[in-house]
């Protein structure tokens, strides 16, 4: 297990982060993500800690607080020293029917953080993340509230999830101007079947030294191979039969799985492990969040850290999963093709370059 720097902070987190969306499952998507009880959740956390995972991610909205409760109880029951684990949670989702029980307003943030601390049985949250982009709250209001929490010692660092690149830049511009705590991490969907963030978010995160925390690296289990016919896999309905998320191009995803299978066979590992290794080996990824419904699934995912794909294997997967560049990226690439001098004579005029 390697440890990577969390954004521009001095904190280090394991390259694998345990996700807790499978804990409880009550009142959350009808339990289709997972329905682990306290004993089962505790065993997953214990196994993760044994594998030297020091990073756990949850959210107040997961099972309407039950996931946070179970996480906190597990850490207490296991006698985990608080400084040995980096605890991350999130705020935004609807926790009650009232008009202000959702969002990234100062009111909702301040109301929510104390409840999260209570459920987690801790006096501080290491990484407090705004779970979604709020179209109705000014960014400065959100950033001021988060900075107040940092100054009060209730949270240590600020992160966001599912935000647009421009909004993160705006947030940190405000933070720099006002002396607020900056956004240090972005939790984003990324997988072989979902590479959207490479176009805008990745260049921004690399330029600004913002950590990338990846959720759903297997695209809701699709890249485990159990939905794609062929090979030795048995096609199963799985989670996507009831909750078809995140959205993917299933024809392309099937082609990706078909490319994953021979690589997995060559290494003697599961298809899922290869897909996770591809994500983990991307230089901009700080930590990959994995969830599990049982210990066997968790153990297979944890073993991804011991698998290193060759440059040729990565190139093969890059090619089969490539997405068409969006504007203005294709235009910038086209017009920078001859930007770097090669030493060869420059030809002026003539036909335009090919697309």
Language model region names:
Residues 1-85, 151, 355:
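N-terminal binding-site loop/beta-alpha segment at the start of enzyme catalytic domains
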Residues 6, 18, 41, 48, ...:
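Conserved, mostly hydrophobic/aromatic
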Residues 45, 68, 72-75, 113-117, ...:
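Generic structural signal for well-ordered alpha-helices
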Residues 1-2, 207, 231-266, 281-285, ...:
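Terminal-tail/helix-coil boundary detector
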Residues 197-235, 270:
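Aromatic-lined glycan-binding groove of carbohydrate-active enzymes
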Residues 26-27, 33, 94-196, 200:
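Glycine/proline-rich, positively charged
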Residues 13-17, 54-55, 84-88, 124-127, ...:
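Structural preference for beta-strand elements that scaffold enzyme active sites
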């Amino acid at each position: 297990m390697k440890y990577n720097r969390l954004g521009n902070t001095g904190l280090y987190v394991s390259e694998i982060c345990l996700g807790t969306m499978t804990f409880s499952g009550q009142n959350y998507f009808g339990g289709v993500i997972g329905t682990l009880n306290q004993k089962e959740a505790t065993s997953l956390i214990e196994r993760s800690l044994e594998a030297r995972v020091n990073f756990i991610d949850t959210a107040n909205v997961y099972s309407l607080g039950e996931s946070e409760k179970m996480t906190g109880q597990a850490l207490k029951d296991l006698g985990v020293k608080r400084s040995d684990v980096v605890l991350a949670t999130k705020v935004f989702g609807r926790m009650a029917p009232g008009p202000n029980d959702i969002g990234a307003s100062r009111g909702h943030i301040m109301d929510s953080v104390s409840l999260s601390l209570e459920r987690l049985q801790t006096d501080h949250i290491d990484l407090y993340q705004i779970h979604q982009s709020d179209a109705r709250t000014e960014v400065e209001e959100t950033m001021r509230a988060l900075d107040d929490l940092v100054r009060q010692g209730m949270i240590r660092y600020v992160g966001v999830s599912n935000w647009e690149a421009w909004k993160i830049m705006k947030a940190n511009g405000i933070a720099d101007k006002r002396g607020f705590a900056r956004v240090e991490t972005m939790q984003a969907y990324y997988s072989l079947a979902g590479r959207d963030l490479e176009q805008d978010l990745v260049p921004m995160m690399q330029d600004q030294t913002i950590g990338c925390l990846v959720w759903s690296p297997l695209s809701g289990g699709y890249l485990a191979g159990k939905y794609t016919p062929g090979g030795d896999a048995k096609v199963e309905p799985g989670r996507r039969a009831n909750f078809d998320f995140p959205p993917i191009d299933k024809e392309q995803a099937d082609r990706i799985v078909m490319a994953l299978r021979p690589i997995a066979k060559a290494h003697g590992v599961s298809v899922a492990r290869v897909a996770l290794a591809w994500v983990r080996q991307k230089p901009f990824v700080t930590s990959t969040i994995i969830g599990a419904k049982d210990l066997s699934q968790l153990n297979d995912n944890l073993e991804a850290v011991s698998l290193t794909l060759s440059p040729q294997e990565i190139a093969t997967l890059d090619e089969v999963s490539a997405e068409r560049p969006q504007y203005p990226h294709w235009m910038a690439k086209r017009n920078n093709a001859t930007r770097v001098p090669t030493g060869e004579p420059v030809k002026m005029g003539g036909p335009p370059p090919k697309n």
